[in-house]
Amino acid sequence: TPPAVIMMVGLQGSGKTTTTAKIAKRLKEKERKKVLMASLDVNRPAAQEQLAVLGTQIDVATLPIIAGQGPVEIAQRALQAAKLQGFDVLMLDTAGRLHVDQQLMDEMQAVSRTSNPTETLLVVDSLTGQDAVQVAQRFTDQVPLTGVVLTRMDGDARGGAALSMRA
């Protein structure tokens, strides 16, 4: 039963919010899906506003911001809204985290338990290089990843990180 939940996870500055909007746009335009995006990032100033602006630009709905709510509460509200309003896909844009930050990892696990995502995508900056392997392993230890998205592939990075993560 809809919605399919896609949870976006990754390190700070890897491009999760932009990638969330890009995937939402593709689902809307190519797959004809009704998509709701929700920002669970309560740590970075303007993160929720950034997703709202991107949503307006690509004409994809975003969950209204309610100040003071935590990530799990936002995820619960987003799931409820997506069900009630007949969305096919709910995209959860989580807070960027430093992989060593156990508090944020615990929060990510709680969101995963609450939302029971169909897909959990790890967003990795391709410029991370071979460190991407350790990043992927740390995230895999915490939540079951279903895929990896490499960002900034237009730079000087090689594809070695992708091959290493697959192994």
Regions found by a protein language model. Give the residues of each.
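P-loop/Walker A NTP-binding module and the surrounding RecA-like catalytic core of P-loop NTPases
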Residues: 2-167
